Amino acid sequence: MKILVKIFALVFISINFSSANEVKVFEFTESELSQLQVRKVRGADKKTVYSIGANENGNYLKSVADNAASGLGKEIKIDLNKTPFINITWKIEQDLKGIKENTKKGHDFAARVFAVKKTGATPLSNRAINYVFSSNNDVGLNWPSPYTKKSVDNVLSSTKNSFSEWVTVKSNVKEDFKKFHDLDVNELDGLAIMSDTDNSKMKSIAYYQNIYFSAE
């Protein structure tokens, strides 16, 4: 299966929650989830099951991917000159130990967030950075997708040192697009969440919370 299909065939709705220094991307409510319409990735046997929950820090999205792949996405304009930092709080309850994530057969992640920049007339020409919660690699590692050089996998968290616990991470998306794609990006066009296990045929359980962009 082509990873470009995974990234760019997601269902997007347009929305924008913003303040001077922060842009919130997802609300993680039942109403929002119903609007996003989970769509199965072409070639996957099943859809990832997404559901809404809550804890003392607010709402979260739970994903269960059992030999499955589907994603949630939003078209949202992010001014990377004002708010270049993506902030993600997430947790992995069941990971994908033993897979080789930089190969086609092992290119699955219990949790990932795509930052997408439109760079052409068609979705297949877009560029993406795939911020991942790895099951096997160290934080700070990165590599081109085994399916396309237009997407780069960048490990922000790893179950090697953060398993079954909430962890918050941050990355400068503007600098990342320059580093990985040699692009000077002033505005981001979309963000997508996906938990997928269709290549490895395994099962993962993950949680997402508080995904937003900030000035610092």
Predicted regions and their residues:
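Sec-dependent signal peptide recognition
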Residues: 2-10
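Hydrophobic h-region of N-terminal signal peptides that target proteins for export
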Residues: 9-18
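Extracellular carbohydrate-recognition regions
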Residues: 20-43
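Extracellular beta-strand elements of beta-rich domains used
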Residues: 28, 191, 209-213
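Short carbohydrate-recognition loop motifs
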Residues: 48-71
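Extracellular/lumenal carbohydrate-interaction signature centered on repeated Trp-anchored short motifs
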Residues: 75-86, 160-163, 184
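Extracellular ligand-binding interfaces
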Residues: 93-162, 202-207
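Extracellular beta-strand ligand-recognition surfaces/modules
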Residues: 108-113, 149-150, 155-159, 163-203
